[in-house]
From Swiss-Prot:
InterPro entries: Ribosomal_uL18_bac-type (IPR004389), Ribosomal_uL18_bac/euk (IPR005484). This is Large ribosomal subunit protein uL18. It comes from Alkaliphilus oremlandii (strain OhILAs) (Clostridium oremlandii (strain OhILAs)). Residues 1-20 are annotated as: Disordered. Belongs to the universal ribosomal protein uL18 family. It holds the Pfam family Ribosomal_L18p. The gene is rplR.
Length: 122
């Protein structure tokens, strides 16, 4: 008999499997994405030093002023552009994309496209 496993449990197991394979370095940090129901958060993380190099979210004033709702693909694309701009200011142009176990679709895809438009390579 099959057991029903929640979507979140599946996402967490995907995330653990991916995190065992990728790490962020100072030259190529990990672009980590956390998606909640109402917002999206992004960090560039150096796993060697355990430091967050750059962060952006849909709660930033620059994003909130431009969009009416923060939990949609439009806001995610703006967050991607913002994190890309901040990363380039710090001299970071290549990253490793960690989608946090989420499927590459919708808000996650929009965020990645926005970061690529801003100049990040992954």
């Amino acid at each position: 008999m099959f057991k029903k496993v929640s979507k979140n449990a599946n996402r967490l197991s995907r995330h653990q499997r991916v995190r065992n394979k990728i790490t962020g370095t100072p030259e190529r940090p990990r672009l980590n994405v956390y998606r909640s129901l109402t917002n999206i958060y992004v960090q560039l993380i150096d796993d060697v030093a355990g430091k967050t190099l750059v962060a952006a979210s849909s709660l930033d004033k620059e994003i909130k002023d431009q969009v009416s709702a923060t939990g949609n693909a439009e806001a995610a694309k703006l967050v991607g552009q913002l994190v890309g701009k901040r990363a380039l200011e710090k001299g970071i142009d290549t990253v490793t994309f960690d989608r946090g176990g989420n499927i590459y679709h919708g808000r996650i895809q929009a965020l990645a496209e926005g970061a690529r438009e801003a100049g990040l390579k992954f």
